[in-house]
């Protein structure tokens, strides 16, 4: 894992937006991942009024969805919440949590956006570019874009459109539940991202990697 996900960023919001534009140009939107043996989910929570960032990573068997390992790290939060710059607040802890897993996953599911972002660099895309890992963003809400009416059944999906471009899919993971916003992060195609998410959905609305990471990240010591 990289020492820093931010390169020579000057620490300002304006500089962060410029870096997002640069890194977005490195995103690979084609399937470039191995046969999946290990997958991971990552999510972030906060403690002490946002002063501590708590990141969880869960490693699973891609075939059985059984949990193989998990890690939870807590570090001081280094940046306030700024819309559109979430990865600058969360990635340092996420990278440490992934580094503490005993093995490197073949694919990482992130609780958050992939390219479905104003500058095409949500946390999943940012993580993928700086780590080199294939990533998918699985968000609970739309950050940008619009979509056509969505069917009510499991597996129904429609494109998420933004400024004439498809940035992801609005996906119904279970019958008559609120949809997920699925977008590729890095080294995963627009077509494959929803399929890979659905392969990890069991009894719950969220796919197992992010559901389990969310549960771990929400757990306080």
From Swiss-Prot:
Top-level division of the source organism's lineage: Bacteria
Site (described: Interaction with target DNA): 81
Sites where the protein binds Mg(2+): 43, 111
Gene3D superfamilies: archaeoglobus fulgidus dsm 4304 superfamily (3.30.2170.10)
A Gene Ontology biological process term: DNA repair
GO cellular component: cytoplasm
UniProt keyword Magnesium, yes or no: yes
Enzyme Commission number(s): 3.1.21.7
Reactions the enzyme catalyzes: Endonucleolytic cleavage at apurinic or apyrimidinic sites to products with a 5'-phosphate
Requisite cofactors: Mg(2+)
Cysteine-cysteine disulfides: none
Keywords of this entry: Cytoplasm, DNA damage, DNA repair, Endonuclease, Hydrolase, Magnesium, Metal-binding, Nuclease
Residue spans crossing the bilayer: none
Pfam families: Endonuclease_5
InterPro entries: Endonuclease-V
GO MF entries: deoxyribonuclease V activity; magnesium ion binding; RNA endonuclease activity, producing 5'-phosphomonoesters; single-stranded RNA binding
Subcellular location(s) per record: Cytoplasm
Top class in the EC scheme: hydrolase
Signal sequence extent: none
Family: Belongs to the endonuclease V family.
Summary of the function given for this chain in its UniProt record: DNA repair enzyme involved in the repair of deaminated bases. Selectively cleaves double-stranded DNA at the second phosphodiester bond 3' to a deoxyinosine leaving behind the intact lesion on the nicked DNA.
Annotated protein name in UniProt: Endonuclease V
């Amino acid at each position: 894992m990289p020492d820093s996900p931010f390169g020579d960023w000057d620490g300002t919001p304006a500089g962060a937006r410029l870096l997002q534009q640069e890194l977005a140009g490195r995103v690979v939107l084609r399937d470039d991942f191995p046969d999946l043996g290990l997958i991971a989910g990552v999510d972030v929570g906060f403690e002490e009024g946002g002063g501590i960032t708590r990141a969880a990573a869960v490693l699973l068997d891609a075939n059985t969805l059984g949990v193989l390992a998990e890690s939870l790290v807590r570090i001081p939060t280094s940046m306030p919440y700024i819309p559109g710059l979430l990865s600058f607040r969360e990635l340092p802890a996420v990278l440490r949590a992934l580094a503490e897993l005993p093995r490197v996953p073949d694919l990482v599911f992130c609780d958050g956006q992939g390219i479905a972002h104003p500058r095409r660099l949500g946390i999943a895309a940012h993580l993928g570019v700086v780590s080199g890992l294939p990533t998918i963003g699985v968000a609970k809400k739309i950050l940008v874009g619009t979509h056509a009416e969505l069917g009510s059944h499991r597996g129904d999906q429609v494109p998420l459109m933004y400024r004439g471009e498809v940035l992801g899919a609005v996906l119904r993971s279970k019958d008559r539940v609120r949809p997920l916003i699925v977008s590729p992060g890095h080294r995963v195609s627009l077509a494959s991202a929803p399929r890979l998410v659905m392969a990890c959905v069991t009894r719950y609305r969220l796919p197992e990697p992010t559901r389990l990471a969310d549960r771990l990240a929400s757990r306080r010591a």
